[in-house]
Amino acid sequence: MAIKYRIKCPQCGEVLNTYHDTQCPKCRNNLYVNQPAMLQLYRKGNFYGFAGAFGIYINGQPYGHIGNKESLIFPLPYGTYNLHIAVGVSRKCNDLLFTLTPETPRMYAKTYIKPGFWTNSFGIEVATPDEMPND
């Protein structure tokens, strides 16, 4: 199975997964996966059994959730982005700031939970294409 694209409708804000160009189910706006740049995010599997979905925020805007061992592609225009991961009320995360340009149109990142003594936090690291799953 191919990796899903995660698209946010610029007209109504609806977030959806797709494998190809589609229409927003809420407002019928045309949505395209072919953007000049992209972020591929992989959530590493968790030994501790924490399989709840992680909330994804790009530039403070919600982009849905990512499940355990899931990989998603976010088609994005060129620009600077802040990636933040959170679950429920736990917002402790080392955000990833990245810029997509014609020279660097792709960003690969992996996220995981970092168990702590009192509370858990979330890690996000830059990754290489070789670290990304193929399906």
PLM feature spans:
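Short loop/turn and low-complexity linker motifs enriched in small/turn-promoting residues
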Residues: M1-D135
